[in-house]
């Protein structure tokens, strides 16, 4: 049913391909554009390039050996997320540029997102509960799960919107109760909550898709995808119908179950649960529609491939010009929905890009290029490298290759199954197979995928996948914290053997694209500073004190205080950058009553910052943003979830956050925690390990606006050593090199370099207000 091919060339009548996994004497012919069989892939076939990899699915072979597939999947090793693909199907059309548009739209109205998260929590409670859950207790759990999000939500500060929100929460709770207790048991539904799996993930190499379901029966006979928003109330008068993007999502899950898990779609009952009504809607499969959807997927992947291959500002600009109301409005809508809601959301991005200066546009396109190339390489591996790299190594690399690199632990047996613990579900696994010649490349806090592996053919592409993090690891045992609790012990059979591998997540890339969005909306003052269009400013009143400073650490602190925009501290290892210089700056800014944000690249470095903060006397109050498993146990009392635990109202959360003037975390964590900046504005950010942080990784934080419209971060201090530990980049130096003369003129020579390095090169003179180099020994 499935064949992996490499495209050689096309002609009017056929594609000519070679098998990837076998030897052929001559190219095979593939018939395409066949009405009612595969003509939906006409646009895909027009985009193919020499050596493009394609999967052919449901292939018929005629007497002449000509292949006629029902599905043509382009570059299947590049996995698209099912929900992201489904969201490209909008009321106004399904142009692939919707995928790029979504990247550049930071979530601003958090109320619908919050309601969705809380509804998911309600579903978990109703599935796990042996007796009837209490609504108020569930809302308390929701508050403990999302304290910052609830406290920062602007809509909830409006009395009427607040009333509506909590009325909606109660309505969704009651509707989920009705669905689970009544509809599940109704004739024809065949849903059994005692034999359910919550949040299983699937990786489907055949279709080039990945996704996570809300609810699945263990035997995969039926599944539920839950939606807290509105269905389509206008398509048919007096009738509620699923929205197209929701129908597409369900269709993709059905296809994944068929092509990854071997579950024929007509034997699976898929349901859309609209908790607003409630409506448990049986979704109807349409393989013709699926082909149209997969053609859109292919066009998105071709777009991504083209951007990373061309590596050209002009080409990227052309692709991004498709983000325009006239292009995306394929259905030529002209109604109120389009004019009032849809058009403005598209046009806002279009106009912001147009409003950039030529230099700013070049910078924007260069970073978009770079991020897209990094993402492509992280998914599919380097197209110029023969080894198995990137997320696709999960299914392309052999067991021997994975074992040699320490990238898999297998033959694991469950010794303790606490997956039903709804607060902190975990598994204790024993290593029954150890290879003394290789060291596992896993450590505490790592994100992993877990799956049953009882025979050599079992892998992430044909088994149900559970996501989690490593809580503890030793030579004999591994303790895994599961992302979702599983009340049903049969989901993870004791008699099975299991494997874990690294999880490859797009979160960091999503945050970098959000950083570009923040750049579009940044203050002109901050954009000019970052692009060297104005000089950094300083308070010259401290000149005398700086000249008379008793030692380097006093001088550093005074220079950091004098800087109005930024200050760079260059320090080789062992010079006391963290233990003395950073501490001295924190103490000085704290005495001045400043709001301080402390950042680093790694969690280990954040632990060191926490160690420094706890050594300050008198004691300072600080909050750490981050994961419990990535935090040293000594500093876990300072984690935000523990600090806010005594709070029972949004006002108490807001007051506790306002009282604390020092916040700590990794750049990656804070970049994804945008709601924090709706509650806090920081006078200064002190950023350690700055030479390990890529410019697009830091851009969003430096460009973000606070609630009043000014910069969310006032000035910033970058601490690092440009001669030590460069940032980790997947693409080669040649690929990340900047050719544009305008960008080279502001010191941007290569995007593998950090912002620290660029600003250091732009320093006015060796003895400057902008930076200071520590001597070799502290």
Language model features with spans:
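A non-catalytic, helix-rich entry segment at domain boundaries
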Residues: 122-198
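Pre-ATPase regulatory/linker segments immediately N-terminal to the P-loop/RecA-like helicase/translocase core
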Residues: 95-98, 273-279, 287-310, 439-558, ...
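Conserved ASCE P-loop ATPase motor domains encompassing nucleic-acid-directed helicases/translocases
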Residues: 13-18, 22-45, 55-56, 376-529
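Conserved small/polar residues in nucleotide/adenosyl-binding loops
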Residues: 3-11, 769-778
